[in-house]
UniProtKB/Swiss-Prot annotation:
Residues 48-52 are annotated as: G2. The keyword GTP-binding applies. The keyword Nucleotide-binding applies. It holds the Pfam family IF-2. This is Probable translation initiation factor IF-2. It comes from Aeropyrum pernix (strain ATCC 700893 / DSM 11879 / JCM 9820 / NBRC 100138 / K1). GTP binds at residues 23-30, 87-91, 141-144. NCBIfam families: aIF-2, PRK04004.1, PRK14845.1, small_GTP. Residues 87-90 are annotated as: G3. GO terms for molecular function: GTP binding; GTPase activity; translation initiation factor activity.
């Protein structure tokens, strides 16, 4: 048998809370989990830890022993049998701990580097936790990195902080205050755990060092206390058939395809009928073996040994061997059934649940492919929060048909006609089709980075599109004919000029300071090199074709302007003002004043529209 039932068979028991660790890359998630395990092993005379598949149970008596120095400050008398920590930290694993309407995880530790503060994945973790309605505390990690910190290995935080210099305590206070501020901005009140009177109203911040072990006693004490106080109903153990979620699908010598699962409710027994989600629909099979790690070993090792058990009780991490598991999808629900009839009903429920996550519509939207149901759900949720519609969401490699779907969208909306591939391969024929159809494929193994890359691309594409639209207009330019640099007087006039503001380009019409049109710029040269444009400060030669005769219509030293049409001026001021330089705007104001004095009716209409717009704003 495996899993702690937590009491006699006749009573309503509490199971272990399932705890997951989240946070930004390199903020110390894995180190913290390792430290918790090592701290528990060090207290082995009280029972050590129980290793599960993908999880470790720290028993209640071990937590009480570790937290013993705090008994006067944080009295810890546990009624839960312990804490089940999911061994693999991170958002992708948390995403797979999914159940309909929430998460299998009962509680989370959000790890924040106290010196670095909030980072992109910290915000993503907050979004995920809010979306799945999972309570959490913050482990403000790496307190040993605070300048001047004097480490006290494995000491409680309330003891080690008293031994620090006032300046060090001041820095810690400041860093904690910054975390409180970021949480407030996210709409979540938080405070240092020692100052909280009602833990239902504020999220606890526990300063720790995963490296030295400082603060770990408080972290475990607060975590255990919070879960058993506020999650008691959720943690009530049910004796019925098991409910769980698939974390991983893998091959195992002697057993073929097996699944690693977390059982969060009920009992799973050898020979039970189980229903689990597959690529082509629900799979019904019978448990052949339940496998747990042999004690005193690192189960992450390839040589790890396993023992068979007859049953497991929630909460537990277990490896399940059964026929027909090849097509199981990670992140899918797994249910035990007491009869064939119940299995049929569960098949319908599993099918409905998977169809909600794997879908194809005729709507305009991005194509999303992911490796598991959990990451697919998390990715689609994250996109929807950002207002990005999804046309297709599915599991598995990117295929040619996925690219064709994106190509259909691209014709209508080029910013949505893309494929977002999370942790999956792109098939060669899909690569070829994407190249042919001009469909962009984004690939990443971190959800936040995948969305960030896509959003950055959209931003750049839209900026490029706006710049293209701006450059289709005649833009403001001001230049002076340099004395002594008249190379040809007319047809076309060729003169040396200095650009005094804005931009001049071939094709732009030219006017004088009275608003009279003189011709059109044919070419701009710097020595023998043709230029596409010249800006403020440039000294270049220009050729002007039209009714201009140097000496009659314009003279050496005269200032000329580009002749910006009224509608172009309006667009520049209303749509592209952020893309043009200050000197260009100054030149446009001069041009508008020249046009006003020349009684240009079109310009006067534009000026009136702009005035009305400013007043209405």
């Amino acid at each position: 048998m495996a899993g702690d039932k937590g009491g006699g068979d006749g009573e309503r028991r509490l199971r272990q809370p399932i705890v997951v660790v989240l946070g930004h890359v390199d903020h110390g998630k894995t180190t913290l989990l390792d430290k918790i395990r090592r701290t528990a092993v060090a207290a082995k005379e009280a029972g050590g830890i129980t290793q599960h598949i993908g999880a470790s149970i720290v028993p209640a008596d071990v937590i009480e022993k570790i937290a013993e120095p705090l008994k006067k400050v944080i009295p810890v008398k546990l009624v839960i049998p312990g804490l089940l920590f999911i061994d693999t930290p991170g958002h992708e694993l948390f995403s797979n701990l999914r159940r309909r309407g929430g998460s299998v995880a009962d509680f989370a530790i959000l790890v924040v580097d106290i010196m670095e503060g909030f980072k992109p994945q910290t915000y993503e973790a907050l979004e995920l936790l809010k979306e799945r309605r999972v309570p959490f505390l913050i482990a403000a990690n790496k307190i040993d990195r605070i300048p001047g910190w004097k480490p006290n290995p494995d000491a409680p935080f309330i003891e080690t902080i008293r031994r620090q210099d006032p300046k060090v305590r001041e820095i810690l206070e400041q860093r904690v205050y910054e975390i409180v501020g970021k949480m407030y901005e996210a709409g979540l009140p938080a405070e240092l755990f020692t100052r909280i009177k009602d833990f239902r109203r504020k999220i606890a911040i526990v300063p720790v060092s995963a490296r030295t072990g400082e603060g770990i006693p408080e972290l475990l004490a607060v975590l255990a206390g919070l879960t058993q106080t506020y999650l008691k109903e959720r943690l009530r153990y049910a004796e019925g058939p098991a409910k769980g979620v698939v974390l991983e699908v893998k091959e195992m010598q002697g057993f073929g395809t097996v699944v690693d699962a977390v059982i969060y409710d009920g009992v799973l027994k050898k020979e039970d009928i189980i229903v689990v989600g597959g690529r082509e629909g629900p799979i019904v099979t019978r448990v052949r073996a339940l496998l747990m790690p042999a004690p005193l070993q690192d189960i992450r090792s390839r040589e790890a040994r396993f023992v068979q058990v007859d049953r497991v009780y929630a909460a537990a991490g277990v490896r399940i061997a059964a026929p027909g598991l090849d097509d199981v999808i990670a992140g899918s629900p797994i249910y035990a059934a007491e009869s064939e009839e119940e299995a049929r009903k569960l098949m319908e429920a599993v099918q409905r649940e998977i169809e909600e996550l794997r879908f194809r519509t005729e709507n305009i939207g991005v194509v999303v492919k992911a490796d598991t149901l959990g990451t697919l759900e998390a990715l689609v949720e994250a996109l929807r929060r950002r207002g990005v519609p999804v046309r297709l969401a599915d599991i598995g490699p990117v295929s040619r048909s996925d690219v064709l779907d994106a190509a259909v969208t691209r014709k209508i909306d080029p910013y949505l006609g893309v494929v977002l591939a999370f942790n999956v391969k792109v098939l060669p024929e899909a690569e070829e089709e994407a190249s042919r159809a001009g469909v962009k494929i984004f690939r990443e193994s971190m959800i936040y980075k995948l969305i960030e890359d896509y959003e950055e691309w959209v931003k750049k594409e839209k900026e490029a599109e706006r710049l293209k639209a701006l450059n289709s207009l005649i833009r403001p330019g001001k230049f002076r004919i340099l004395p002594g640099y008249v190379f040809r007087r007319s047809d076309p006039a060729i003169v040396g000029v200095e650009v005094l503001g804005g931009v001049i380009r071939p094709g732009y019409p030219v006017m004088d300071s009275q608003g009279r049109e003189l011709g059109r710029i044919m070419a701009i040269k710097d020595r023998d090199r043709s230029l596409e444009e010249a800006r403020l400060g440039a000294a270049v030669a220009v050729s002007i074709q039209g009714r201009i005769l140097i000496g009659r219509h314009a003279n050496e030293g005269d200032i000329l302007y580009t002749n910006v049409p009224a509608q172009h001026a309006y667009k520049i001021l209303t749509e592209f003002k952020d893309l043009v330089s200050k000197d260009e705007l100054d030149v446009l104001r001069e041009i508008a004043e020249i046009k006003r004095r020349a009684a240009d009716h079109e310009y006067n209409k534009v000026l009136l529209r702009l005035k009305i717009k400013r007043v209405s704003q």
